[in-house]
């Protein structure tokens, strides 16, 4: 059905839709588990995280996007997390993204005392033809910002990747969700 506003309006709508599209790719939640601080360094080939947290929620996610390729033209790519919706003022603490079993070229902005990923490597697709990534979420905070406790009160966790320093300015991925039910199951399995 032709637009009653003509081809110019249709072209403008297509341009605006493209501008709103995620430029860092689309990511899909895969799973979440509760891990001790010591379990973080080995699978990611970078220096151990020395942040003072005893445990993390390790969020597994995947994409068709190769973050090493995207990182070639960007200053930094960071994971962002919050209680859903993503603009919740809580500001959940998250480290990443990291490639599963592989180091990323990206240098995410890291808190003091936390090491960034090591040297770049060629990322390989998993058995499903996707790139596998992780982010490490601090499951509870009682000071230094609004408090939250995903161990005692699991909630849906919204995540997104943000980039800076690219030709297009600030860029982002889609928002993907680690459901409260998956977090609850991870906490129960990690508590055994």
Language-model-detected regions and their locations in the chain:
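Bacterial N-terminal signal peptides that target proteins for export
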Residues: 1-9
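Secretory-pathway extracellular proteins and peptide precursors enriched for disulfide-bonded cysteines
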Residues: 11-12, 73-77, 123, 137, ...
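C-terminal motif of bacterial Sec signal peptides marking the signal peptidase cleavage site
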Residues: 16-19
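Bacterial signal peptide processing site
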Residues: 21-23
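Short amphipathic beta-strand and strand-loop transition segments with alternating hydrophobic
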Residues: 25-50, 119-123
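Surface-exposed edge beta-strand/loop patches
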Residues: 26-34, 127-192
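Short, surface-exposed binding/anchoring microloops in extracellular/periplasmic proteins
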Residues: 39-106
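Extended, solvent-exposed segments with strong compositional bias
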Residues: 83-144
């Amino acid at each position: 059905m032709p637009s009653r506003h003509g081809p110019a309006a249709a072209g403008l709508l297509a341009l605006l839709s493209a501008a709103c599209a995620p430029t860092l790719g689309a990511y899909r939640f895969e799973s979440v588990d509760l891990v001790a601080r010591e379990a973080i360094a080995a699978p990611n080939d970078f220096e151990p995280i020395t942040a003072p947290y005893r445990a993390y929620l390790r969020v597994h996610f995947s994409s068709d996007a190769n973050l090493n390729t995207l990182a070639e033209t960007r200053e930094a790519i960071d994971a962002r997390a919050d209680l859903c919706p993503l603009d919740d003022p809580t500001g959940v603490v998250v480290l990443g993204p990291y490639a599963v079993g592989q180091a990323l070229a990206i240098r995410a902005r890291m808190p003091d005392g936390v090491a960034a990923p090591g040297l770049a490597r060629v990322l390989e697709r998993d058995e499903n033809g996707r790139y596998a990534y992780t982010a490490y979420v601090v499951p509870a905070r009682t000071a230094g910002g609004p408090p939250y406790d995903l161990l005692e009160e699991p909630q849906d966790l919204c995540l997104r990747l943000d980039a800076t320093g690219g030709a297009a300015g600030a860029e982002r991925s889609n928002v993907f969700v680690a459901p409260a039910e998956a977090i609850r199951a991870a906490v129960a399995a990690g508590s055994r």
